[in-house]
UniProtKB/Swiss-Prot annotation:
It comes from Microbacterium ammoniaphilum. It is an enzyme of class 2 (transferase). The lineage of its organism: Bacteria, Bacillati, Actinomycetota, Actinomycetes, Micrococcales. Keywords: DNA-binding, Methyltransferase, Restriction system, S-adenosyl-L-methionine, Transferase. The gene is mamIM. The keyword NAD does not apply. A gamma subtype methylase that recognizes the double-stranded sequence 5'-GATNNNNATC-3', methylates A-? on both strands, and protects the DNA from cleavage by the MamI endonuclease. The keyword Acyltransferase does not apply. GO terms for biological process: DNA restriction-modification system; methylation. Its EC number is 2.1.1.72. It comes from the Bacteria. This is Type II methyltransferase M.MamI. GO terms for molecular function: DNA binding; N-methyltransferase activity; site-specific DNA-methyltransferase (adenine-specific) activity. It catalyses: a 2'-deoxyadenosine in DNA + S-adenosyl-L-methionine = an N(6)-methyl-2'-deoxyadenosine in DNA + S-adenosyl-L-homocysteine + H(+).
Amino acid sequence: MRPLRHAVGSSTVTLETDLTLFPEDLHAPLLGSAGNATVDELALAARFDGLHQLLYTRGGVRPTNAAIEEVGKLLLLRLWLSRDDEASVDGVGLRALFDGAVPDESVVEVTKKAFTQVLTVDRMSLRAVDGSSRPLWPYDEPFRLAEPTVLQSALALVNEILGGGTRVADPLGTAFDAFLSGRYDHSGGLGTYLTPSSVARMMAEVVLDLLSSDALADVRAPIIADPFCGTGRFLVAAFDAAEERHENVDLAGLLDGGLVGADQSTTAIAKSGLNLLLYGAQQPEVYAVADSMTDPGLDRLRGTLAAVLTNPPFGGGKYDDALGIDRTRELFPSVRPNRPMDPRLLDSRCLSNFCDPGESLG
């Protein structure tokens, strides 16, 4: 067992990790979206697991989804610092905040103000369906982590993740993997189910092998989408697979407009957009929609995409949107109008419509 001690402010927080054995409640998935789990990824998952325990027992942030939300906000702040070394709030530089130089008595207030400010920075935003910019979180979204010692530890961990100058595969997905397996998440369901990263990566590799290199060489419009994007796991898996398996890929074009995500959940959109920003996107195209299958903004993609990668919603006869049911009856005439149905039927009908004829749906 190797302790990781962070001296932050006036406190020292110790996170226990073991890089040779998984914690008893952490299984051994292929963490992140990398094809093979590296020591760095396993160490990151172990640190997230330790941070999860701190947040849950001492941070006052529950449930797991809320804890991951606060970690995501800190990742956004650290990314802002990476893109602007002079970033500051009320005369306090973000560099000092992440280096542990802000004392415990003021670290919470400084972090709250910094988070409010970063939401107004245009180059840390998302691109909406109409082409305008919008913040990852609403402008009035609060920063909720208010225990100074735990916040200092979280700042130190985030600084480690983004301060090394190398890209970390799917950090938010890795956080979910670790947090979802955490031993303290027993008070109610999370309501979030992630496709295992190994499955997402396998699907991305198969689909990307079917695409021609020419399709990826000059990306000027959306070519790969996930209409139910969650944390963006399929989108970053597609990017990783394209980067590794094709030559002369327009990586910048792929990140800024070539990959498109949509989701009903605004918090999922924040995580997905942040994941793409962490990969280098300048302004990711991820949208919050009322219904991914009937949203007018997504209708523009129908019949245009080279690939759709997704894990659609499922379960029960609970879908009752009249337009969605009418669209489904075009493929499944036996579906009764004006009666709730299993959303998987709608997904089969409409997801195939997103793709250009002859292209791939995963």
